Amino acid sequence: MEINNGAQPENAAVSIPSRSPSGKSEKRKSPSIVSGCRTVMNERSFTNYWSVERFTVQLELHNPAEFMLAPKFGDGDYEFVMKLFPNGKDEETAGYLSLFLLINKCPNPRLRFRVSFTVETADGPRSCHLNKNLVTINRSGIVTASKFFSLDILRSAMNVYIPNDILTIGCELTIFGECTTQISSLFKPYQRTHSASSTSRSLSSPNTKCLKIDESSAHDAFTEFLSTGEFSDFIIVASCGREFPTHMCILAARSEYFKVLLRNHSTKEFMSKRLQFDDISARTLDVLLRHMYASAAGRVVKLEEDQLTEDLISAMDRLMINSLRDEVARLIGSKVTVDNVLTRISMAAELRLDDTYDVLLDFFSNHKHECMKLTAWDELESAKPPLAIKILRDAFSNTDSPSTTSMDSRIIDRITLT
């Protein structure tokens, strides 16, 4: 009797399902569809230089609000004109050069651009730029630099800023046009090659010795030098007669005013190593100097509410301590009330803090009837009539049409010295 136990012959073919290494049956992937496109922006750039000879004579011949016009520049689609006020555009800016850029011709209703004004000096170009990286204004609009350059600084270093009695101003414009999107070839990701990675790693090999600097100790040392006067080489005197022993390297590094003043070794201040301010208080100088020394060590000393005074704002603008601008903008834009908005909006206007000015203007627009009943409004009208008119005009324009009218009716004043 034969018993069949189901065993297969040795040479019999056995069918085994195909499986992936993970034990699952493989599934064929459907092909992916890849496409690409690129968006490009049309740009145009213009550069124009204007040299004014016998500039010291021009200063004598022109009163505030009197101006000079440069020839037009541009191309067939765009046309611009520079307008210079040697002694300021009005009495309020009489201590500064004022520079306007007029847009005479533009193919589009609105113009988007980035602008840079420069003064060509014996030490190279000094540039001024807009606080906002990108500016949009209407066709036939005006860009103004009301306080383009201090005449006091110019006169203190005439051989630097007007060599051979020639003032040369440069204007660089980059205009951003419409964007176009086109279908392009397949996108190829950027490859980070092994060689680039190994080069990067080699710069920080274990055998490399690094010098680590304790920032807190540097800050403490700088503050101590200011407090003790150790190693000081320059004396600043406040209006009350209090003396501050300081260090020229810190002053020049943190203030454009002192950089220009101390660069000219023939000035009385440099030779005597002493500078007296008849209109800046000791309290204000103490706040400014502490900030300058802290920022030189990479620290920021926050301003207190009681330190925010008009004396501080004027001194900061005069000494061109640009590193303090963000802290001032933060402080004057917070805890705004009907009682303090007028003082703060005046500060924002003086420092040309345009974003902060717009925020404060919105608050004033919503409470203008209350604000205009305050004594502070009467004082502003009496002390700074042009500013009071500007604030009022901007407020009503802002109320009428927040999206466009305020932008259209205001002259943009956004240039600061760098």
UniProtKB/Swiss-Prot annotation:
Keywords per UniProt: Ubl conjugation pathway
GO BP field: proteasome-mediated ubiquitin-dependent protein catabolic process; protein ubiquitination; regulation of proteolysis
Top-level taxonomic group: Eukaryota
Region described as Disordered: spans on this chain: 1-33
Boundaries of every BTB domain copy: 232-293
Cellular-component GO terms for this entry: cytoplasm; nucleus
Keyword Ribosomal protein: no
UniProt cross-references to SMART domains, sorted A to Z: BTB, MATH
MATH domain residues: 45-173
Pfam family, one: MATH_2
Pathway where this protein functions: Protein modification; protein ubiquitination
InterPro entries: BTB/POZ_dom, MATH/TRAF_dom, SKP1/BTB/POZ_sf, TRAF-like
Positions of disulphide bridges: none
GO MF entry, a single one: ubiquitin protein ligase binding
Subunit structure: Interacts with cul-3.
Function: Probable substrate-specific adapter of an E3 ubiquitin-protein ligase complex which mediates the ubiquitination and subsequent proteasomal degradation of target proteins.
Listed name of the protein: BTB and MATH domain-containing protein 41
Organism in which the protein naturally occurs: Caenorhabditis elegans
